[in-house]
């Protein structure tokens, strides 16, 4: 077993119980989270799961790292995988890219309709309960919705339903693909 020297409030003990998450936070060199805002949130009592004090004590070693793309690899000015190249100064190729995306996903091809896109984990934590609440109203507007991700069956079912219910306006793909 573990020695008594670890059973202290500055190591493993947390409110009378062993807490291995606390131990991980205590013994890690740095602490990373999925975003800068989440790094701040977990330092509050509401999101800190009783570890907020420890996280605040180590706030200079807590970092949020944004998910993102490699701008060199996904640069529309040089990306050979897209139908047409474009830049901030010359957007002429962007319309062709949009039209091909709409066609490939079974959306109505329309250069004037805005596309709302989401790539990520389909989870209540991402606020998708709010999308569930307003999806009917949202899709009554002149918009299209593209969802790419994997996650909770509740949201897979929601977006599968929406794709059938709002033909030509919603496309959902349940895999991580670029």
Spans of model-derived segments:
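Catalytic cores of nucleotide-sugar-dependent glycosyltransferases that transfer UDP/GDP/TDP-activated
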Residues: 1-178
């Amino acid at each position: 077993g573990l020695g008594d020297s670890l059973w202290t409030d500055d190591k493993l003990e947390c409110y009378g119980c062993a807490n291995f998450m606390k131990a991980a936070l205590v013994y890690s060199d740095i602490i990373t989270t999925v975003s800068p805002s989440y790094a701040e949130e977990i330092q509050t009592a509401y999101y800190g799961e009783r570890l907020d004090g420890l996280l605040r004590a180590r706030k200079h070693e807590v970092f949020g790292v944004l998910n993102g793309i490699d701008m060199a690899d996904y640069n529309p000015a040089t990306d050979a995988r897209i139908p047409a190249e474009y830049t901030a100064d010359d957007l002429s190729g962007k319309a062709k890219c949009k039209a091909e995306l709409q066609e490939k996903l079974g959306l109505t091809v329309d250069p004037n309709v805005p596309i709302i896109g989401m790539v990520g984990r389909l989870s209540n934590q991402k606020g998708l309960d709010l999308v569930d609440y307003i999806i009917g109203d949202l899709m009554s507007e002149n918009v299209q919705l593209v969802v790419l991700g994997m996650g909770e069956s509740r949201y897979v079912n929601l977006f599968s339903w929406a794709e059938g219910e709002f033909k030509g306006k919603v496309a959902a793909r349940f895999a991580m693909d670029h």
